[in-house]
Amino acid sequence: MTRGFAPILPVEFHKMGSFRRPRPRFMSSPVLSDLPRFQAARQALQLSSSSAWNSVQTAVINVFKGGGLQSNELYALNENIRRLLKSELGSFITDYFQNQLLAKGLFFVEEKIKLCEGENRIEVLAEVWDHFFTETLPTLQAIFYPVQGQELTIRQISLLGFRDLVLLKVKLGDLLLLAQSKLPSSIVQMLLILQSVHEPTGPSESYLQLEELVKQVVSPFLGISGDRSFSGPTYTLARRHSRVRPKVTVLNYASPITAVSRPLNEMVLTPLTEQEGEAYLEKCGSVRRHTVANAHSDIQLLAMATMMHSGLGEEASSENKCLLLPPSFPPPHRQCSSEPNITDNPDGLEEGARGSQEGSELNCASLS
């Protein structure tokens, strides 16, 4: 051993690990290295959605052409639509069906009807409607069954499309005048069913045109007239054949009676709407309905009618007798009241009637 030199001993140095931990897979913030994987998954999802929608589109067009669904095809179509509802195309399914698929399918129906002329067109239209209402419409409802809770259902959209794209384009009004004697029952059914479908925005110009057609085949007819002088639609009763009725002459009291006119939009109730799904329950609160708050006026009107009929029945033998009602009779309408205004003492009402009859000269309503 040499003096002054220390022995050289081997020393092992352990390398410390990196402080950066591996990124967990469940973290939401992606990194640049994950971008190709995300793009591949997005492309696969788009291809799957495109394939699913192509299958739905092909099936719908085939139904309009008169074909049917294959075995287990309806289940596959429903699953494809459920998958589409969860994708980016979910909110556009109803709009695309209404503006693209339905218009394309009804185009074939319209061309089939326009090939015929005269009274043959009515017969072809009746056959087309029977097939559409019994075969095409139920199949469309079954295919788009997962699409629920929309503003308009698939059934309503299809019927409105048939009205606008088929019925109103074949100019049925002139043909109805020629075929009144042998009009097929399917035409009357078609007009009444299409009239029962209402747009959520109120009566449109197409709806008023449809009512003009219904008026030619249905009597009596209660519908909406297209008078533009009012702020809203007016309800009119139209008859094709007049009936003889007893003439009623109405004579007023000596005191003038002022008629109070109310805006039309306050008197006309909104039409009933057909809804499906959970959205109908959410909209129930906005539907205008009759309540028991107006029961007092109905009871008073019923009592008045009973008194008038009883008076006319007892005094039918005399010619110049009529029912007299005192001007002091309480008004039939009271606001902010939940109980009917019924007189506690009916004898007082009779005494008031006799006193007013003796004291003043009154006119009455006489039937001739």
From Swiss-Prot:
It comes from the Eukaryota. Ubiquitinated. Ubiquitination by RFFL promotes proteasomal degradation of PRR5L thereby modifying the substrate-specific activity of the mTORC2 complex. Ubiquitination by RFFL is stimulated by LPA/lysophosphatidic acid. Disulfide bonds: none annotated. Interacts with the mammalian target of rapamycin complex 2 (mTORC2) which contains MTOR, MLST8, PRR5, RICTOR, MAPKAP1 and DEPTOR. Interacts with RFFL. Interacts (via C-terminus) with ZFP36 (via C-terminus); this interaction may accelerate ZFP36-mediated mRNA decay during stress. Interacts with RICTOR. Residues 335-344, 357-368 have a biased composition (Polar residues). The modification Phosphoserine is found at S28. GO terms for molecular function: ubiquitin protein ligase binding. Associates with the mTORC2 complex that regulates cellular processes including survival and organization of the cytoskeleton. Regulates the activity of the mTORC2 complex in a substrate-specific manner preventing for instance the specific phosphorylation of PKCs and thereby controlling cell migration. Plays a role in the stimulation of ZFP36-mediated mRNA decay of several ZFP36-associated mRNAs, such as TNF-alpha and GM-CSF, in response to stress. Required for ZFP36 localization to cytoplasmic stress granule (SG) and P-body (PB) in response to stress. Residues 327-368 are annotated as: Disordered. Belongs to the PROTOR family. It comes from Homo sapiens (Human). The keyword Oxidoreductase does not apply. This is Proline-rich protein 5-like. Keywords: Phosphoprotein, Signal transduction inhibitor, Ubl conjugation. GO terms for biological process: cellular response to oxidative stress; negative regulation of protein phosphorylation; negative regulation of signal transduction; phosphatidylinositol 3-kinase/protein kinase B signal transduction; positive regulation of intracellular protein transport; positive regulation of mRNA catabolic process; positive regulation of phosphatidylinositol 3-kinase/protein kinase B signal transduction; regulation of fibroblast migration. GO terms for cellular component: TORC2 complex. The gene is PRR5L. InterPro entries: Bit61/PRR5.
